[in-house]
């Protein structure tokens, strides 16, 4: 008698055999193979020298695993006839491999006798586009098994989980006569795959790659496949094939595939995963992440080894998420600046790590919770070790690869419909690009200009001529262009408009168009009469050849075009380098001349230029042009967060600079100031256009006062005192009386926001108030900001006598709708925290003069501690000694202490403090001419020195700063991220009911 454990092992063996039979499609699931009865005694001889007897069940098992068929099954395994009338005689598998049979599965059974060449020609003529393998939808984890019928309809094969139909795609590979065939279909065409995927293939000829035995596959694939295999690939509707040669796979270990067993798991070389940012959004418009369920670029968690190995996707195609902040991620304060939104009660997106992997839980992404978004990420070489046990099997000396493009340069003929579509596309010249048919129908989320797809939107109409002697580019602008980077533009002839500013001839204007904000647009303006040719061609001939100038003259049309001279913004080189060091995102571009249509011009300019489709630039509503401005205009711009107050301010400044030589910008936003540093309010005379964020110009304000916080809830009274004093200083200065005022306010529209607005209107006495409304209700005030509404406000926070509202003046109320363009899915944008961080980096870059690359390269200024007054911005509970020690290696505000609150002149970095000599060494980020006025230092409060300055101290410093916690892989401004939790009731809408 056999032992009990031996019987258990045998039962387990039969169960595994049955599972393999079902998974490989050799048996129907309806007819399970029952394990044999308990064998009799003496079935297995106890004598080692005598051969063991083989039971009938063992013979049946061997026959099932053998590729040879018994006489009983020969009819079911017979090869499908070449046509309906011609039958193929039975033969063994080895004999069939000697014949050159190019029979391939066809959607139409009549065409099954065509050879490989005919099929290749048909597939090539049908489309010139190369199919690119896609990963399936991640949210559809429930597999759908595809059942395949044999030719005589007597036997059904159930595909393994590898061939599931997941969402938009289903994929399968089959070895046939030394060829590898891959079929890819869409979810909408599942019926085509079910009917035509495997029903034309016999079980003796064609073998699935997913063999359950290593010997089965090796024995049944002939030598032709190992030496010179051919690869086919079938697209969605109907079988189309691409044939090309690949190298012998057994010579390259990295090409050896890892098979998948019944559970669909497998070892992959490169896969796509998703990083979830748990954010609560108020509108679909503000969702900046991908929605993978609508895109073919995203797939399920059940990855096929063939697809994974063949994907040619790099992580560089997607933006790094190391510094990814959404509009809703900044939870530091209730009243932050424009782009900040109320949101995430769980965690800040600053804490997301780029190596995040979703947990391996079934149904994890089936129904994502409200606010849960996904961000694609490429992780390469996840599993380098070969699989063990029964999970996967490795085929030795064999390889499977996807389509290999043999000749990219050869363009097959196109159909008439495709020729008609591409006639318009050929108007623009770009580098050769492989495009899938799905890519022609709609814009993929990854088709974002400049930093996603550098070949997108090339401009052929405009003409660019590069100087051989300098970094100048002479251009004829014929259509709207958008810019990514910074450059200096000089108008030579014609008329152009740059974000509302009409450039004057021979005037050099500086453009800043960083990533994360709307691109700056350069648009030629049509004229009624041809403009005069006032270009100094002789002067241009010093940098350009005669042939180049002749091409410019020939292509220039006087009524519609403009001639401009572009050159690199060398004065901003330190600023660009600082952003490159301390920002994970490429706020300014990394120019690569090899893959851009105008790479040489962009290399000279260190800036990317392309034709604008007006989807990523500022679109000015007509009502904006109806806002009239006079010399005595006092215009307050109010609205919630992210409604476009700064964009409107810059447009009004740019449009009216031709009428007024200068204007006064009063910036009352302590979270996201337009000109000066955060935690301050200021006023600045503007006499040049703001063609980009104002803080990148590093302008010095006329007056500035330190508030000391970015959250007005924590400094409400101090903020009001600072505003009252600043307005009094402006009103007492006669030079500001005859120029227009533009007042930028905070985006704090809840809580006591309307009470604060009433106080501002009472003190400033405006002539106009522009209220910008957002489609997101939470970003709007609870009532209209007219005179009657503000007059009925009963103060609660500002109830003291010094904040008493006397009488609300009369003013004109302009109600506008937000003109902020819809954000593209998956694009990175500057959040409020990013804006403050960028503002600080821009200001600190002004310290780096000459050849200085770090703060340690700058010569500090020494000053006696006895001559300085040391203050804390929001508290008086600290001693002088504590404040002095807190300033070391940190940012401080450089102020002049006079009557009232101290006047802020700029910022600086305390390099060191000599306690024995009582001297302080300072690196100022302000003009040295005003340093003689500094007699007071105020601690930076929340504004600390970015960590990158402590980590990268220059080549002359060999040791780290003592007592400083440094993360080598961090580029953020703080080592420990602060997470703020806000109750959903604060927003007035339950978390599960938000849009």
From Swiss-Prot:
The keyword Amino-acid biosynthesis does not apply. ATP binds at residues 639-646. Residues 75-94, 110-129 have a biased composition (Low complexity). Polynucleotide 5'-kinase involved in rRNA processing. GO terms for cellular component: nucleolus; nucleus. Residues 18-173, 271-359 are annotated as: Disordered. It comes from the Eukaryota. Residues 279-354 have a biased composition (Acidic residues). It comes from Drosophila melanogaster. This is Polynucleotide 5'-hydroxyl-kinase NOL9.
